């Protein structure tokens, strides 16, 4: 019998395991560890959202929904998106409800890419981007952004990466793992490139409610989506969801907004793979969109306080750290210690029981940094920072 490992598809064999999950598994069952690793809110989903899911179950709403998702949810999404992103979509044909934003990402690449076609995206980046492109038989083309330039994606670098095989530009702002926010003037230049070269833009804006404006980061910042710029609505696929801002990670719910012909193509794949997102999750999402804004702002302000704490503590340790404009991550620079990001993270875990994620998990551009998530209780962050300070002091 041929060994089972030889039966695995070649393009799957080459996929690496998620660097985030590798470290998550190292801390499972260890009560002494303070995890700054997994990018998940420490807040429980607000009660009124959970109650909507419970009420849905009590009413016996346990069936399939339309492949596109409940029309009532798509109508609420359309209102929410128009208010937040300043761009309108037809809930009947231009919105697809998915099982998390990760599914939406998978669908858009499988719907749009032919084998060998290229997707340009910026690193450091979310760990799923490269594998999602590879699984759709596309070719990842990376642009390395740098802390010295505030992790800005420069349109000039995008233009230099465009070839006759380029089909998609993938954006993620605010960015995981850096918290960077793209300046509007660069978005405008990238939009002009998309029009000039007739490219589709896929924009993952899952963290857009979590912005930190003002000198102290406590004020809500202003988000601008590339989909709202002139000429971009009909060549953009806007991805968003409920996991981060609404603290609904376990509900596994996201959505894609795009012109009807693109939504239809994505839906055809979705109907054969997932069929639909869970009914009770969709009912909870309706409640989140209708009445969740105060809770989102309460959580955002709490993250802002933790952000400020972590920035202050890293500065006190002498660890250079970019000041994030959004999301809930810090990406301190650890290069001066002469360790790889994985070595640094493993030693910090072994010696001080603090879990962070090696920057290398987010692409080559992430090497030399580690990701620390501040979606963790303020008191735990204080303890983790004390431990980390002792660790870097020993490193000298």
Task: Annotate each predicted stretch with a short phrase.
Residues 60-64, 299:
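A short acidic, glycine-rich active-site loop
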Residues 64-99:
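Conserved N-terminal alpha-helix of the aminotransferase class I/II PLP-enzyme fold
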Residues 1-16, 26-29, 34, 38-56, ...:
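PLP-dependent class I/II
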